[in-house]
Amino acid sequence: MARSVKKGPFIDDHLMKKITKLNSENQKKPFKTWSRRSTIFPDMVGHTVMVHNGKQFTPVYINENMIGHKLGEFSPTRTFRGHVAGDKKAAKK
């Protein structure tokens, strides 16, 4: 279910403070965050955010196409190791 329009998009306060501070100082250095639930705002474009995936921090460079999405969408939490190629048991009938 989508978030209500009257509530507006969500972003953690500490994350917004970091972005406004970096924008006021004209810095583009990467910074770490655990806030995967925060929505990407237009103020964040051009920054590199290190998003935690439960094990390590994944660098995410924010561009215009990411606005409105969540930070967690760009930092996968699970590793896909592939399917077994030689499994013939399921194919028999």
Curated annotation (Swiss-Prot):
InterPro entries linked to this entry: Ribosomal_uS19, Ribosomal_uS19_bac-type, Ribosomal_uS19_CS, Ribosomal_uS19_SF
PROSITE patterns: RIBOSOMAL_S19 (PS00323)
Listed GO MF terms: rRNA binding; structural constituent of ribosome
GO biological process: ribosomal small subunit assembly; translation
GO CC, any one term: cytoplasm
Keywords: Ribonucleoprotein, Ribosomal protein, RNA-binding, rRNA-binding
Pfam family, one: Ribosomal_S19
Coiled coil start-end: none
PANTHER family linked to this entry: RIBOSOMAL PROTEIN S19P FAMILY MEMBER (PTHR11880), SMALL RIBOSOMAL SUBUNIT PROTEIN US19M (PTHR11880:SF8)
Function: Protein S19 forms a complex with S13 that binds strongly to the 16S ribosomal RNA.
Family: Belongs to the universal ribosomal protein uS19 family.
Annotated NCBIfam families: rpsS_bact
Protein name: Small ribosomal subunit protein uS19
Organism name: Leptospira interrogans serogroup Icterohaemorrhagiae serovar Lai (strain 56601)
Organism placement in taxonomy: Bacteria, Pseudomonadati, Spirochaetota, Spirochaetia, Leptospirales
